[in-house]
Regions:
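Ligand-binding cleft/hinge of the Venus flytrap
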Residues: 1-9, 37-44, 118-119
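Tryptophan-rich aromatic "cage" segments
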Residues: 116-128
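A ligand-binding cleft/hinge motif common to bilobed small-molecule-binding domains
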Residues: 19-21, 26-46
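Generic secondary-structure signature for well-ordered alpha-helical cores
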Residues: 82-86
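Histidine- and/or cysteine-centered catalytic micro-motif in compact active-site loops
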Residues: 12-13, 32-35, 54
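Short helix-initiation/N-cap motifs at beta->coil->alpha
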Residues: 1-18, 57-59
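Periplasmic-binding protein-like
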Residues: 43-81, 95-114
Length: 128
């Protein structure tokens, strides 16, 4: 490739971290939630590794349902998710999963991701 001699797909973030620790890889992209959960619960999984950079803040991964889901069901799902993050009964669960809120997002909220992709392509990073 243009930037690395080889690209490998480990199959999981945890395996990518192992590959780094075993010096089978030079760099890996690990999502911030996985990284934070490992820092909190299994710091040994990050032993000997250093974060060399962070991507800009972006909306989280979308929650997806079937396109044919009725509007009433969508509303019920959204209400349930909002209750989950608002109800004290679920606070410890949300804290454990690093969930601090829920909000409906439009497709436009994800536009910065496409802009970053386009910016990278303009700099010559369209694929590794």
């Amino acid at each position: 490739g243009r930037f690395f001699s080889a690209v490998m797909f480990s199959g999981s973030h945890r395996q990518s971290l192992r590959e780094l620790q075993q010096e089978n890889a030079d760099i890996a992209a690990i999502d911030c939630v996985t990284y934070a959960l490992l820092q909190r619960h299994q710091p040994q999984a990050l032993a000997g590794l250093v974060a060399i950079g962070w991507s800009p803040a972006a909306p989280g991964l979308p929650l997806i349902t079937a396109g044919a889901t009725p509007a009433a069901t969508l509303n019920s799902l959204r209400e349930a998710l909002q209750q989950l993050v608002s109800d004290d009964r679920y606070r410890s669960l949300c804290d454990a999963l690093l969930i601090c809120g829920y909000s409906d997002m439009s497709r436009e909220a994800y536009a910065p991701l496409l802009a970053w992709r386009d910016e990278a392509a303009a700099l010559g990073v369209s694929q590794l």
